[in-house]
Curated annotation (Swiss-Prot):
GO CC, any one term: cytoplasm
Pfam family, one: Pept_tRNA_hydro
A biological-process GO annotation: rescue of stalled ribosome
Compartments it resides in: Cytoplasm
Site (Discriminates between blocked and unblocked aminoacyl-tRNA): 9
InterPro entries according to UniProt: Pept_tRNA_hydro, Pept_tRNA_hydro_CS, Pept_tRNA_hydro_sf
Name the UniProt record assigns to this protein: Peptidyl-tRNA hydrolase
PROSITE patterns linked to this entry: PEPT_TRNA_HYDROL_1 (PS01195), PEPT_TRNA_HYDROL_2 (PS01196)
Residue sites binding tRNA per the record: 14, 64, 66, 112
This protein's encoding gene: pth
Family recorded in the similarity comment: Belongs to the PTH family.
Reactions catalysed according to its record: an N-acyl-L-alpha-aminoacyl-tRNA + H2O = an N-acyl-L-amino acid + a tRNA + H(+)
Gene Ontology molecular function, alphabetical: peptidyl-tRNA hydrolase activity; tRNA binding
Amino acid sequence: MRLFVGLGNPGTKYQDNRHNIGFMVIDEIARRHGFSPWRRRFQGETSDGALDGERITLLKPLTYMNESGRAVQEAASFYKIGQGEVAVFHDEIELPPAKVRVKVGGGIAGHNGLRSISAHIGNDYLRVRLGVGHPGVKEMVHGHVLGDFAKSERPWVAALCEIAADNAGLIAKGKDASFANKVHLAMQAKGFLDEDKKKSGDNKVAK
């Protein structure tokens, strides 16, 4: 059994924010794989199903980003699972838009959702890092992640959510590198990883 956590902030005010791309991917997994209806528990919303024969619970913490760890800890405690069975899908400003990387453990790079989760369950969980680009200067990061995806960005966001959801069974099976590779190749094939498309809208990619 594995716990897939999507990070974001609750409410319509935030639903299209870059910070909410974790929610978006988790929602797409539930839709595309016929998971159960969402229900309120563990200080969030959960949906149950299976990916490639592996039992999965999806969790969207409704605590707001900075307290996401409380919901994750409650769910992990209920299911008696360790860090190794937790995968967290989150926005990553250090990656160009549409880029995906997967890693276990490591730093939190200033991400308050990851900071909260690490404080509650430890640091050695899987992170699925979903690139949303960097605004170019540190002072603009807050407004960037809490800003909505631009209209020009929506095609790659939709494609990334669909492709990540279609290949999520690889994460369920522990094939993290294969997941990242398949997502990269599929996004590249759709033309979303071309150099001239990495700089979505007026955003600059951090060097």
